[in-house]
């Protein structure tokens, strides 16, 4: 019987931690200044050093969506969700981007996942209800 092996987690040096934190702060501040392209660039630096940094993936996705780069945003949300599947806001924001792409069925599925994790998520509830209410009568088109 083969034994399943797992890849050991990378242990970061203090210097690497400092670099990740520096790049993350720069990215976050660029986002606050609405310099989304610059923010994405710095989130890429974070991800290059720490590929499991789910908050960097999530923030990068959000900033890509603000740049109307929806496909790239969805891909980043997918990574963030894979790394941290219990945060309902990840599913909600992915659903919102899918709405912008007129992918209503997929958006509702994301809102449903979000509501499984957090039944009180107002944003997911509101947009899910809005989509369901307007499906079929072309109010979104």
Predicted region positions:
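Conserved structural position within tetratricopeptide repeats
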Residues: 47-48, 79-82, 115-116
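Alpha-helical segment of the N-proximal tetratricopeptide repeat
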Residues: 17-49, 66
């Amino acid at each position: 019987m083969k034994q399943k092996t797992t890849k050991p987690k990378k242990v970061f040096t203090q210097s690497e931690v400092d670099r990740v934190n520096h790049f993350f702060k720069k990215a976050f501040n660029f986002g606050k200044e609405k310099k989304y392209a610059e923010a994405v660039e710095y989130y890429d630096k974070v991800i290059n050093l720490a590929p499991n940094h789910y908050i960097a993936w999530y923030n990068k996705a959000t900033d890509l969506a603000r740049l109307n780069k929806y496909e790239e945003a969805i891909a980043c949300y997918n990574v963030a969700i894979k790394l941290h599947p219990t945060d309902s806001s990840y599913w909600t924001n992915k659903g919102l981007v899918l709405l912008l792409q007129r992918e209503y069925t997929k958006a509702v599925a994301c809102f449903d996942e979000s509501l499984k994790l957090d039944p009180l998520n107002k944003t997911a509830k509101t947009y899910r209800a809005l989509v369901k209410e307007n499906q079929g009568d072309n109010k979104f088109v």
